[in-house]
Amino acid sequence: MLTRRRFLGYSALSPALLASRPLLRSGFAMPPASSSQAPLRIAIIGSVYHLGSNLQSIADRFLVGYPYAGNWHMPNVQVVSLYVDSLAPKFAGPIAWGRRLEAARHPQGKRNSGQGPATQPIELGPPHPPIAQSVRRRPGALGLGIQLPEKFGPMTDLSGVRSREFGFRLCRNIPEALRAGGERLAVDAVIVVAEQGDYPTNSKGQALLPSYDFFQQCVQVFEEERRGVPYFNYKQLSFSFPEAQQMVNTAERLHFPLLAGSSFPVASRLPDVDIPRGTHVEEAVMVGAGGFDGSDFDALEAMQSMLERRKGGETGVKAVQLLEGDDVWQAGREGRYSRELLSSALSRSDTPMGLTLLDGRNQDLVASGVLPQLVKNPAAYCIEYADSTRATLLMLNGAIMDFNISARVAGKELVSTQFFIPPTPNETNTACLADKIEQTFMTRKTPYPVERTLLTSGMLEACLESRHRLNQRVETPQLGVKYQPPAESQYTRT
């Protein structure tokens, strides 16, 4: 359906293309494989490029390389263009997408808001990004000079700094980024990180991130060129499951690889274990920390990356319920989730709080009964799978600060591990993800199915719908997503 925000989002594209009928699937050509010698040309599209932002964490891996398997790895790629949505109001031409204009309709306001209101009108600027700034030379650790803005801090935009250092083009809209300033598709792959930034939220508390809008604009260029390129979308496909489903269907129809998701499923694990493929899983409990519509997606997808390996593969989710407050503890007393699995998952944590912080003693947070004292606002994401497998994600802010899981596998002992997520700025988990992105770009094959991220996107949306309905159980017939996991585990082992 063509809505006002969709029309505004596509206004940067050619009128002739918008008026044309969809191209036939059979006429969509596969591009020739890139030479192993020539670097792949990459366009990067994102929301904000600040120090510590998700975009910086991913994009910098393809500019300076990353540690992997005991070595420093430099991808055989060349970043040729960058579009940053937070800079769009400073640039000439129409805004690249229209969802920001709907902020007034959502009384919940904005997540990670900036200086101005989301409905701030776009002012036309000069024909090219104003990236020239007053800079000073600051010595690096090895005496190397690095150009940094005069006023450098956590919220300083890095687009201009990186553009000058690495020589790529800053673009005013997404089609320009894919064409690298020319008239034809000029990149071999696309990286999209539509996270954080100044976006409105809806009544469920979901940030209206523009992942789908960015994707649609890229697809318009692909269709005009009658060829697509590998595409990576960081974290959830969309806040809307129908939009996420359409993204997957479009990639399949147009024959280009679509990889998506969080770094958690591919991060190292402590210990190095996985659920044996094809075994029966009775129940799983995941524990973590964070907020709604944030790190809960990371945790849900990490949990899904293990549970999809159960007998029969993934068959979908039939219902969800998000519990809060005392209802979380009551659910444990009633057996809605296993306290044994909860204790097992917590035993993998390296960040226990409570008495451990006060006097160094270890304690069983479950048996001692201190969890309700430590966790003031608990949340439980209860997932009922179509094959009767049960899973619960417990967000326990105040008790732990890492992410751990325990699962009961039929005929075996409990399988438990920690998803190892180092603190910033190292975040080697994103290096693990960068390796999977690079693998997809080089081979034009995804190492794991995008349906994992599709299902997780739908689970999160349904859980937030449950919360919106005062924590009622919500049936999810739309989440009958079926797929088979990869034959080999894809998390990092070296």
Model-predicted regions and their roles:
Residues 39-41, 77-79, 185-189, 226-229, ...:
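Loop/turn elements at helix/coil->beta-strand transitions in domains of secreted/extracellular proteins
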Residues 1-15:
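N-terminal secretory signal peptides and thylakoid transit peptides that target proteins
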Residues 288, 298-424, 431-451, 460-463, ...:
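Contiguous beta-strand/loop segments that form the cofactor/metal-binding neighborhood of enzyme cores
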Residues 195-265:
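Beta-strand-loop-alpha-helix segment that lines the small-molecule cofactor/substrate pocket
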Residues 29-107, 123-163, 284:
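N-terminal Rossmann-like dinucleotide-binding module
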Residues 42, 257-269, 277-292, 314-326, ...:
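NAD(P)-dependent dehydrogenases' Rossmann-like dinucleotide-binding region
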Residues 161-189, 193-199, 214:
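A structured beta-alpha segment of the ubiquitous adenosine-cofactor-binding alpha/beta core
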Residues 44, 188-192, 233:
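Redox-cofactor binding/interface segments in oxidoreductases and associated redox assembly factors
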